[in-house]
Amino acid sequence: DYKLVHHCRNGRSVYSFCMCPGGTVVAAASEPGGVVTNGMSQYSRNERNANAGIVVGITPADFPGDVLAGVEFQRRWESQAFDAGGRNYCAPAQLVGDYIAGRPSTALGSVVPSYTPGVRLTDLSACMPDYAVAAIREALPAFGKQITGYAMNDAVLTGVETRTSSPLRVTRAKRAIACRWA
């Protein structure tokens, strides 16, 4: 169990989320035309890979508009991932070394992705806002200095995990049972 955090020059924070030893990257989409990933481990934790989410902090300022703007923001990137994955529910993926260098991946290395129905090697930058791309590019080498092998060149980034937090917040009034959108 570990927690990695990197505070980037662009003001964003990047952190590891939900490390799954001996785990699998799984499909988690709930709507057609979107790709969403998540990670899990079986009880035995004996699969060939470990996986962890890499998360960039966002705020409501990143998706201004009405109360459902966060949902639309999430759907946008899930749709972009669907397109980048080949529009067949394969997930877009990229090797860490290629991601940091800003070039699309064309062949896997020693790490075999676990995502079913499969991955399509590409450039993940099409699936995230520019500030997230830059933040993760900066954070990965820093994480690699903290945990040997974390940012190895042929590790596989499989995207996108867009549901670490709810895109909508419902608050309750302190002295009533009524709810209001926030």
Question: What do the predicted segments below correspond to?
Answer:
Residues D1-A182:
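Residues forming the flavin
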